[in-house]
Regions:
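Short amphipathic alpha-helix that is part of the acyltransferase structural core
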Residues: 1-16, 28-30
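Short loop/turn motifs at secondary-structure junctions and domain boundaries
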Residues: 17-22
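Short hydrophobic/aromatic beta-strand or adjacent loop that forms the aromatic wall/cage
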Residues: 24-26, 126-132
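Conserved beta-strand in the GNAT
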Residues: 28, 34-43, 47-55
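Conserved acetyl-CoA pyrophosphate-binding loop and the N-cap/start of the following alpha-helix
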Residues: 60, 64-72
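Conserved GNAT acetyl-CoA-binding A-motif
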Residues: 76-90
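Conserved catalytic-core motifs of GNAT/GCN5-like acyltransferases
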Residues: 83-87, 97, 102-129
C-alpha cells in the first residue's frame, strides 16, 4: 500500500486496487529511493497475464519511464505466459498500440458497472473497457 498514491493515478478506486493487488505482482521503477513508475500484473489465464495498473509520477511523465517498465515486464512475463492483456479506455489505446497491443474485445459498461463514481479521462466519460492483447512469445 506504500505505492497507493501512484496506483490511484491510474485507477481512482482503492477498493478495485485492493482486489487486484492481492492477486498480482507489483513492479516498481525507482530513482534512488523514490518510486517513479509502478505496474501491477495479474494472471489472466493459464497462458496469459493482465496489466492491471501502470502509473507514473506526474513529475516524471513523458520521460520514457513507463516505456522502460513495460519493456521489462514483457521480458519478465514472456518466460511464464504467451500473451499479455491490458484493459483501458479510448485515450490509453494509442499508448499501448506503440508496444504492439491490438484490440481483443470490449466489456460494455465496465466502468459504469464497477465504479461507484463516474470516471472521466481527458473530459470523456468512461463507460466501456477496451481489452488489448500482445503476444509475448
Amino acid at each position: 500500500k506504500q505505492y497507493l498514491p501512484l496506483l490511484l493515478l491510474a485507477d481512482p478506486c482503492e477498493a478495485m486496487i485492493d482486489r487486484y493487488l492481492e492477486a498480482g505482482d507489483m513492479h516498481v521503477l525507482s530513482i534512488g529511493d523514490a518510486p517513479v513508475c509502478v505496474a501491477v500484473v495479474t494472471p489472466y489465464s493459464d497462458t496469459a497475464c493482465e496489466l492491471k495498473n501502470l502509473a507514473t509520477d506526474p513529475q516524471f511523465q513523458k520521460q520514457g519511464y513507463a516505456t522502460r517498465l513495460m519493456e521489462t515486464l514483457f521480458k519478465f512475463y514472456a518466460a511464464r505466459f504467451q500473451a499479455m492483456y491490458v484493459g483501458t479506455a479510448g485515450p490509453g489505446v494509442a499508448f499501448y498500440a506503440r508496444f504492439g497491443f491490438t484490440h481483443s474485445h470490449t466489456v460494455t459498461g465496465f466502468f459504469t458497472d464497477n465504479y461507484p463514481e463516474p470516471l472521466y479521462e481527458d473530459g470523456v466519460l468512461l463507460t466501456d473497457m477496451l481489452y488489448l492483447k500482445k503476444e509475448l512469445a
